[in-house]
Amino acid sequence: MQLLSRIVLAAVLLHLTPVFAQAPKKAVASPELQKEFDGFVGKFRAALKANDSAAVAGMTRLPFMADSSIRDAAQFRAKTYPAIFTAKHRACLQRGKAVYDRDGENNDNYFIFCGQTIFVFTKTPTGFLFTETGVND
């Protein structure tokens, strides 16, 4: 009887293994969220196409990346915009596909990958904003 119990237990555990081994489900944005982001990114891309640093600063969460030296639009335009939004990155952001995901704090984010740089756009209480860049590793 003890042997039969062990065999049944082993069979049950083997049967459950694929359930735990499955890849996590990929996050999918709701149609409403996607529509909101599409509207935002259209305006963001138009500002980049015009090389309008003031408009981009207005669509950016400040202080940028929690850096107190980039706490307002003037500082963003002077320090960050020229360094991050090179002609190459502006062109990439025009054509780059945005990828949706949720972060560990359950925030809705879209990412656009441009070479070694990731551009992050986050849903905030006031709508979507450009929130940070990161290294594409």
Outline where the language-model segments fall:
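Bacterial N-terminal signal peptides that target proteins for export
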Residues: 1-8
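N-terminal signal peptide c-region/cleavage motif recognized by signal peptidases
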Residues: 16-18
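Hydrophobic helical h-region of N-terminal Sec-dependent signal peptides
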Residues: 9-14
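C-terminal-biased regions
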Residues: 24-49, 53, 57-137
